[in-house]
């Protein structure tokens, strides 16, 4: 079974943990408890292929930025999350993306831009078009709006990253070994 190392990045309070826990455990975490680093494993099937996802839920706060290079070096796919209710969280993602590209030393990194908390439409300050435009600027990066609370596009975030990784490095099809018989 192929393993995938996915990393969830973004500013503090955007809902990285809520998205991850909703995906892995199917529950919504109401209380905000800042993360230092949490790792989750979940077995899923994407496009008829069994996959083991290792999801790293990272700290959004500035005091843990030294750990980021390591996440970025080891990660295969990245969800860059902002809150549609806070413009600053959207603005912070440009630097994060540039850091990923620098650490990976390539422009071709499986990545998805995620506008979280789309259930809070009344509090929206970042328009959907802003997200779409930024994704276009980022070499047509994938983009979704999500809500951990309302379970909107939660699975799709992680499945999309798996598909991007598979496109970059296709899954080896299992070849049946042919038994050979040699007569002496």
From Swiss-Prot:
Carrying Cysteine methyl ester, the residues are: 181
- Subcellular localization, per the record? Cell membrane
Q: Which reaction does it catalyse?
A: GTP + H2O = GDP + phosphate + H(+)
Q: Where is the lipid attached (S-geranylgeranyl cysteine)?
A: 181
Pfam families in the record: Ras
- CDD domains named among the record's database cross-references: Rap1
**Which residues, in ranges, are excised as the propeptide?**
182-184
Residues annotated to bind GTP: 10-17, 57-61, 116-119
**From which residue to which does the signal peptide run?**
none
Identify the domain of life: Eukaryota
GO BP annotation list: Rap protein signal transduction
Q: Which GO terms describe its molecular function?
A: G protein activity; GTP binding
Name of the molecule in the record: Ras-related protein O-Krev
Q: How does it sit in the membrane?
A: Lipid-anchor
What's in the keyword line of the UniProt record?
A: Cell membrane, GTP-binding, Hydrolase, Lipoprotein, Membrane, Methylation, Nucleotide-binding, Prenylation
Record family assignment: Belongs to the small GTPase superfamily. Ras family.
Concerning PROSITE patterns, the annotation shows: RAS
- Residues that span the membrane, as ranges: none
The short motif Effector region is annotated over 32-40
Q: What is its EC number?
A: 3.6.5.2
* Cellular component aspect of the GO annotation: plasma membrane
What Gene3D superfamilies is this protein classified in?
A: P-loop containing nucleotide triphosphate hydrolases
